Amino acid sequence: AEQNDKVVQLNHGSAALNSLFQNIQRGIPQEESDSGLIIHNWFCDSKKACLADFVTATVDQMLMLALKRKHVMLLHLGLSEKVVVIDEVHAYDAYMSEYLEMALQWLGSYNTPVILLSATLPSARRMSLIRAYLGIKKFDDRFEKEQGYPLLTWTDGKDIRQQRLSYDGAHKTVSVKTCVSDDVVQFVKNVTENGGCVGVIVNTVRRAQMFAELLQDNAKVLLYHAQFVLPDRAKKEKQLVDLVGKNSTPESRSGLVVVGTQVLEQSLDIDFDMLITDMCPMDLLLQRMGRLHRHERGVRPDTAQT
């Protein structure tokens, strides 16, 4: 490869099903290619994937930094020379968080830049992650009391600084109503009959299947959850983005109901006119609300105004 060509690697269990990744040129780039990106077979081995120039992976690949396992030194070598970006850092449970903090200790000892992203990270959790990266147990508690939003917190390895960021986006007030399962059909009909689309996010696959069956006689229903086999899930995700994504049309959205589980609440750029959700922790509820009136669309149904 030419000196300026960069090797990219997608490192997760369904990488072979990702069409964008599979369409990147493999081996030595052709002279007429100007993308500068290639896939090299040498890096396709899971133990060596982290050594590529750019790597996109699921978080469990990074958490293995904290484990005593064969070939872990290759992971340390690969990540220590990169900028590590971890998205949705609020979403990890107590078990994963222990491994995350240990991994941050390693990265901090290498002076590896780490960027943690979240829209709903509690202040106490923010401080515990910084303590792990710096390898310290205590510091000025005024940093934990800072409640600005959006808030940027950073450290150069010695001092900790925080800065409130300006937010130019439109603020919205969300109307919240409680309902029981028997009322869901009527709530949905009120929106879909006026040309709107509805998202229904529940906490189990069984409930998602139940609501999809319940609603299919009154609306177009798309069911999406994590138990679909990977090829089907990839097709459904593309269909979902086409129907209710940023570039979706009023025709594709009209009368549509998307029923799913927690896989709908993160990392999908989709937009519902009305959202129905099970009870859930507040940070997850805010994530789900992020799929409500996400894009500017002009007029929405009267029954789905915020």
Could you tell me what each predicted segment is?
Residues 137-208:
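Conserved interdomain linker/interface between the two RecA-like ATPase lobes of SF2 helicase motors
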Residues 74-83, 90-162:
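Post-DEXD/H (motif II) to motif III coupling segment of the RecA-like Helicase ATP-binding lobe
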Residues 1, 115-117, 197-203:
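Conserved RecA-like ASCE P-loop NTPase motor core of nucleic-acid helicases/translocases
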Residues 48-52, 68-84, 252-255:
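Short basic/glycine-enriched coil/helix segment immediately N-terminal to the Walker B
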